């Protein structure tokens, strides 16, 4: 089953965060993942800022083992419509539009995706539960 794991899921998995075990099953098979280039941007920027460029490039090598989806005019326009409809930021709208366009589930722990169609939402509130 193909899925799109949001940037927050990649970061949880890469840093062995508290929710990493919830994201790991979705990231186990890189070839079944869809990764829009805007997600690569977010991930590279975060890893380079928080760690270093060498590790950021290693993470990009991982994402390049997935099905990388470039930004097209059709995706940009669809993302704009979704942004207006759901009040999503630019990158979040592109990520959601990519998942919807390719008919895959978006897996995320970002609150603004909760309740949207075709989203597997992993709530952060699990962090405070025993």
PLM region descriptions:
Residues 7, 73, 92-93:
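Conserved glycosyltransferase catalytic-site signature
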């Amino acid at each position: 089953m193909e899925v799109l794991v949001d940037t927050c899921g990649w970061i949880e998995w890469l840093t062995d965060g508290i929710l990493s075990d919830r994201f790991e099953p979705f990231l186990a098979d890189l070839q079944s993942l869809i990764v829009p280039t805007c997600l690569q941007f977010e991930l590279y920027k975060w890893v380079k800022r928080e760690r270093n460029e060498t590790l950021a490039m290693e993470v990009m090598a991982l994402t390049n083992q997935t099905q990388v989806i470039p930004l097209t005019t059709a995706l940009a326009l669809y993302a704009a419509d979704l942004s207006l409809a759901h009040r999503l930021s630019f990158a979040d709208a592109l990520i959601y539009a990519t998942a919807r366009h390719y008919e895959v589930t978006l897996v995320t722990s970002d609150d603004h995706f909760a309740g949207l169609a075709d989203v597997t939402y992993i709530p952060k509130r699990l962090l405070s539960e025993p």
